[in-house]
């Protein structure tokens, strides 16, 4: 009866991987069984934040862009590409995202993906980080 009512109401049952009451093993197995190979490989991709990418794209010379891997410039890649990959679930994390607005924007993109896997947002900071206004580093 419940299944019929759910079908009539147009509601879908929550996938196991989104059910917090299911065990971690059940959730992981369910999610992996739903993922395509492209999505699994995509979940190993980490990019720099879009604003970091834009800033380096305009502040570096052509030679620096071609030879400097420390600033994480991706030759031939556009912001549109990065947004599209995120919408398709082909990015798992971003580094150098400095504002909550950008972090929220990126998370909204990831929630448009088929499986809605949230992103990890990080910063590459060995000795602490004070990139956000008002932070204290100990």
Where is each model-derived feature located?
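N-terminal beta-rich core of secreted/periplasmic extracellular enzymes
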Residues: 10-138
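Bacterial Sec-dependent N-terminal signal peptides
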Residues: 1-13
